[in-house]
């Protein structure tokens, strides 16, 4: 029984209820019934009518009766309402309410169960099946709803609901192998007429699952001729915990660990899975508690564990919690988990985004004092993070601070900074940064000029692009293929085809190899302006690099298109 998967593991029992008793109708049906009765217009000339029961006695009010018209006038049309109409409309209304609550709380940290409880919708098997059908491509969300529905009063899953859930878990594009464990347990119960699965049987199922599907460990051990010290079932157990955590059922996953840890010894990966689960649902207190328990158990968290958690908290805006975890990492962490420049970069960006400039620069000094030397990736992460948060002034201060401490930025750092400014079309800031590069005697590279040229064309400023081209000649920076491509594309976009054809001819004369996609786009542009001579010349040039027959056929095709366009 899948709806009690978690409680089975927690209580070491697996109860299967296949009750076929129809659920009670909700008060919603009565409301819809009243609306239907009010909408029926009865002709005053009705001569006679007979009384019939509306439906079976399973309605809330079995004494309710409805008049059934025997005779009406010829010019009157009568609207009938029956039990199927009421059931369908009521079911659709309930499905709409539940689906809206689910869609509004899709994230793992959202309390979907609370939102569903507040919807106050009485569950029926058709309603549950319709919700599962709508969530057939979101197996994690579907399983989360299925688990919630199974714990509601006055409702129990019927076989059709189990079939829907099993089909979703086994037919999605992710092919989650974890749920094959559930299939094995259901098969065991069916074949042995059991309502309880023993712990020993569960361990045997996990062991067989590991041997059948997690074969990479055994293959590695056989190839290297080593003995695997870990229990084979712990790998399958960790995968099951991971599935629960990804579905937002972290509390149930931790309860499962508490019940099973005396039979299956947890490893570091077990704690990491639950730790990431608490971070995913944004519960730092329980995450820190589990981390302390992990250390007490003799497992040393790796640096990746801390970095992933800090990054998760920072993205969620929980900077104080991330700072507490960072301090815990320094004070109680081991040498293996000591903070690196990447960890400092995450915290620096988070503090800058939350307008904590003083703490940000204090952390920079702390990074230098601990011996974490900044590298290119550190500059890149910090500058990109600050610029994306529109903290350009703080990014400049960061460069000044690092320069004062003896770590001046290089051309790669400046280019990372410049790329963010150019992508956000901040022309003044980009030119200011370029002037700063020149003043600091950091020679701009060809990538620097390429970004400036692309930015000017995006800002519809071809003169600025030509000035950048001239600046390259003054500083003896040779243009590469990307420079020519940026200039030619920009000139075509600005409807300056003559200058674009001139540069394209220069590409041919220099013997530069154009990327085939760019070559294809240039031929299309030349075809639009009707320059057949340039088409043939570029095609002949590209024969040196690409398939001759393909280039010839493409050129002839473009020639015919150009001739046809000119004829119109």
UniProtKB/Swiss-Prot annotation:
Start-end of each PPR repeat:
233-263, 267-301, 302-336, 340-374, 375-409, 410-444, 445-479, 480-514
Q: Which GO terms describe its cellular component?
A: mitochondrion
**Which key words are in the record?**
Mitochondrion, Repeat, Transit peptide
Q: Where found?
A: Mitochondrion
- Family membership: Belongs to the PPR family. P subfamily.
Task: Tell me the PANTHER family matching this sequence.
Answer: PENTATRICOPEPTIDE REPEAT-CONTAINING PROTEIN 3, MITOCHONDRIAL
What is the official name of this protein in its record? Pentatricopeptide repeat-containing protein At1g73400, mitochondrial
From the broadest rank down, the organism's phylogenetic lineage runs: Eukaryota, Viridiplantae, Streptophyta, Embryophyta, Tracheophyta
